[in-house]
């Protein structure tokens, strides 16, 4: 049997426990309860000879089990998570005010059943492995979604840049048309000035040949 002992406690107050072996597991477990930090949630393991005490503390409620060293960590902690959920679901807020062993008569049977299940039923490890794979897939999905969102942001940024480029192109064309118009008008003015200058030069030359500005010799 992989799991041999289990308890549920609030701080150092044991609310329910069950043992499947004649050892001093209960004594050691209560000593461990005094060492577990009282403020933070934690998952820890303590080695004792060929046994390991696994402890899960969540929201002030501590679930502990003693398992054979060969059981590893996955099955014991899956057991602790299962027990924690069952206990909270069954007793709710009563766990915060219950006296020592107040739930033992009823819940010790649940501990016994779940110890037997997680120790002997091959489906227990299979289900835990599937849960682990599902969590891994969920993590990959979240990662992929994050990447898609990141690509979406880059796409949105690219669209914004394209819109800016189009706006710049429109402004450039407008400025180019205005520049061409200004150049054309300058050319027209310059042409008119050149024609007028040429006419003045011709007039001066003719006036010189015709002996006066009124052109008396040529009229």
Curated annotation (Swiss-Prot):
Membrane-protein topology: Single-pass type IV membrane protein
Gene Ontology cellular-component terms listed: plant-type vacuole; plasma membrane; vacuolar membrane
Pfam name, any one: Synaptobrevin
Tissue: Expressed in flowers, leaves, stems and roots.
Sequence intervals crossing the membrane: 190-210
Modified residues (N-acetylalanine): 2
Vesicular topological segments: 211-219
Longin domain segment(s): 7-111
SMART domains: Longin
Subcellular location: Vacuole membrane; Prevacuolar compartment membrane
Domain of life: Eukaryota
InterPro entries reported for this sequence: Longin-like_dom_sf, Longin_dom, Synaptobrevin-like, Synaptobrevin-like_transport, V_SNARE_CC
Name this polypeptide is given: Vesicle-associated membrane protein 711
Organism the protein comes from: Arabidopsis thaliana
Taxonomic placement: Eukaryota, Viridiplantae, Streptophyta, Embryophyta, Tracheophyta
């Amino acid at each position: 049997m992989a799991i041999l002992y289990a308890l549920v406690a609030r701080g150092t107050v044991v609310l329910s426990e069950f043992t499947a072996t004649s050892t001093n597991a209960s004594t050691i477990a209560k000593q461990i309860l005094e060492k577990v930090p009282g403020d933070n949630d934690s998952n820890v393991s303590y080695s004792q000879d060929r046994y390991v005490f696994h402890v899960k503390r969540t929201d002030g409620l501590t679930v502990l089990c003693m398992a054979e060293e060969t059981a590893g960590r996955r099955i014991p902690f899956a057991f602790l998570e299962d027990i924690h959920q069952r206990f909270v679901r069954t007793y709710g807020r009563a766990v915060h005010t219950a006296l020592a062993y107040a739930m033992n008569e009823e819940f010790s049977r649940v501990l016994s059943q779940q110890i037997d299940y997680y120790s002997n039923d091959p489906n227990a490890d299979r289900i835990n492995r599937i849960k682990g794979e599902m969590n891994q897939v969920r993590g990959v999905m979240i990662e992929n979604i994050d990447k898609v969102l990141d690509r979406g942001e880059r796409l949105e940024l690219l669209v914004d840049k394209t819109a800016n480029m189009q706006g710049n192109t429109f402004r450039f064309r407008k400025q180019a048309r205005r520049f061409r118009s200004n150049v054309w008008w300058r050319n027209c003015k310059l042409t008119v000035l050149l024609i007028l200058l040429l006419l003045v030069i011709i007039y001066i030359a003719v006036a010189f040949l015709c002996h006066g500005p009124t052109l008396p010799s040529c009229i």
